[in-house]
């Protein structure tokens, strides 16, 4: 697709020099003072620590009435809940802890079914993800773990949550945010030439590159979000991606703790990384700022910015359609196409 009018080109946005500028110099403005989430309900996945926890905290600061912490470990989720309840600035919003395991399709479906039973759902932020130091596979699906969690299970959840997000309040549609990454723009994505595409992620890599695979998993999400936004009107659910930037104080790279690569990465993070509170603010902007103009777009530092350059290349249309068809076929048990059609009927 042709890029909308941005303040920066996709290629410049993806450059390392611009990344350093964003990390060390750029500022994220505060959320507008008139934003009030009183009466609203939000889900934040991966919210027991790091960016997810800080995002949840900031939503409560904005007056959110009900927060659902979606976590793999209920014990850690309950500890996060207690931390938020003890925060005097977080108000008196209700906080629930729900189990969600993105390595299991059954868990995703059960979570989505539970969400559909809510009286209302205004915001869903899909923040949970992982960064794998070693290549491993999910036995039940055969897919490499990073692609399974960051892409397949995440887009299954985002699509299943659309029905719950379909607003009962005509003044503002529900908002669905997929947390993305700068690394999507840096991915070589050699798998784009394969047909089918997804099946390549069931094969062992010739040489494991954890940043490349993480970036590819986030790029796949950008392709899917772009296709999904074409099929779901912004007036029904507004869908966007958020880039929190490279932050310290997160558990994303915990899989590499104790390794030389992990030590180097954590040291680098302390030099150029942003505090999690700043990264979370970008996510919150994607959830509460903007209007329908953010639909199908990518928000960073309180602005709408370009996604990975490939998203705007001529070949993106064919790649996006191929990936969409393969993804819906892989997730056919969930009847996602029918769910999408029901939203607009």
Curated annotation (Swiss-Prot):
<comment type="function">
    <text>Short chain dehydrogenase; part of the gene cluster that mediates the biosynthesis of virensols and trichoxide, fungal natural products that contain or are derived from a salicylaldehyde core. The pathway begins with the synthesis of the reduced chain in virensol C by the highly reducing polyketide synthase virA via condensation of one acetate and 8 malonate units. VirA has interesting programming rules since the first 2 ketides are fully reduced, the 3 following ketides undergo beta-dehydration, and the last 3 ketides are only reduced to beta-hydroxys to yield the trihydroxy portion.</text>
</comment>
<dbReference type="InterPro" id="IPR002347">
    <property type="entry name" value="SDR_fam"/>
</dbReference>
<keyword id="KW-0560">Oxidoreductase</keyword>
<feature type="binding site">
    <location>
        <position position="101"/>
    </location>
    <ligand>
        <name>NADP(+)</name>
    </ligand>
</feature>
<dbReference type="GO" id="GO:0016491">
    <property type="term" value="F:oxidoreductase activity"/>
</dbReference>
<feature type="binding site">
    <location>
        <position position="51"/>
    </location>
    <ligand>
        <name>NADP(+)</name>
    </ligand>
</feature>
<dbReference type="Pfam" id="PF00106">
    <property type="entry name" value="adh_short"/>
</dbReference>
<feature type="binding site">
    <location>
        <position position="76"/>
    </location>
    <ligand>
        <name>NADP(+)</name>
    </ligand>
</feature>
<protein>
    <recommendedName>
        <fullName>Short chain dehydrogenase virG</fullName>
        <ecNumber>1.1.1.-</ecNumber>
    </recommendedName>
</protein>
<feature type="active site" description="Lowers pKa of active site Tyr">
    <location>
        <position position="218"/>
    </location>
</feature>
<feature type="binding site">
    <location>
        <position position="218"/>
    </location>
    <ligand>
        <name>NADP(+)</name>
    </ligand>
</feature>
<feature type="active site" description="Proton donor">
    <location>
        <position position="214"/>
    </location>
</feature>
<comment type="pathway">
    <text>Secondary metabolite biosynthesis.</text>
</comment>
<feature type="binding site">
    <location>
        <position position="127"/>
    </location>
    <ligand>
        <name>NADP(+)</name>
    </ligand>
</feature>
<comment type="similarity">
    <text>Belongs to the short-chain dehydrogenases/reductases (SDR) family.</text>
</comment>
<keyword id="KW-0521">NADP</keyword>
<feature type="active site" description="Proton donor">
    <location>
        <position position="180"/>
    </location>
</feature>
<feature type="binding site">
    <location>
        <position position="214"/>
    </location>
    <ligand>
        <name>NADP(+)</name>
    </ligand>
</feature>
<dbReference type="InterPro" id="IPR036291">
    <property type="entry name" value="NAD(P)-bd_dom_sf"/>
</dbReference>
């Amino acid at each position: 697709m042709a890029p909308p009018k941005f303040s920066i080109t996709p290629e410049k946005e993806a450059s390392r020099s611009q990344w350093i500028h964003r990390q060390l110099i750029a500022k994220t403005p505060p959320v507008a003072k008139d934003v009030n989430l009183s009466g609203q309900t939000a889900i934040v996945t991966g919210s027991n620590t790091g960016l997810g926890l800080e995002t949840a905290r900031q939503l409560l600061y904005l007056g959110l009435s009900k927060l659902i912490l979606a976590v793999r470990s209920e014990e850690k989720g309950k500890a996060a809940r207690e931390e938020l309840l003890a925060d005097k600035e977080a108000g008196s919003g209700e906080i629930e802890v729900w189990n969600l395991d993105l390595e299991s399709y059954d868990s995703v479906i059960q979570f989505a079914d539970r969400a559909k039973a809510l009286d209302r759902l205004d915001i869903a932020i899909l923040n949970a993800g992982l960064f794998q130091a070693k290549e491993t596979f999910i036995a039940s699906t055969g897919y490499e773990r990073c692609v399974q969690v960051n892409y397949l299970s995440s887009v299954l959840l985002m699509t299943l949550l659309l029905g719950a997000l379909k607003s009962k309040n005509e003044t503002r549609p529900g908002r669905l945010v997929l947390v993305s990454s700068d690394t999507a723009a840096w991915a070589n994505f050699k798998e784009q030439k394969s047909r089918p595409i997804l099946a390549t992620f069931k094969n062992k890599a010739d040489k494991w590159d954890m940043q490349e695979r993480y970036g590819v998993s986030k790029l796949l999400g950008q392709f899917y979000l772009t296709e999904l936004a074409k099929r779901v009107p912004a007036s029904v659910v507004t869908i966007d991606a958020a880039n929190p930037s490279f932050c310290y104080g997160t558990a994303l790279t915990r899989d590499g703790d104790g390794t030389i690569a992990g030590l180097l990465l954590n040291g680098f993070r302390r030099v150029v990384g942003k505090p999690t509170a700043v990264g979370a603010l970008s996510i919150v902007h994607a959830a509460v700022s903007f209007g329908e103009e953010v639909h199908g777009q990518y928000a960073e530092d309180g602005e709408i910015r370009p996604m990975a350059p490939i998203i705007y290349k001529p070949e993106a249309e064919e790649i996006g359609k191929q990936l969409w068809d393969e993804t819906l076929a892989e997730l056919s048990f969930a009847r996602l196409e029918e769910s999408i059609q029901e939203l607009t009927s």
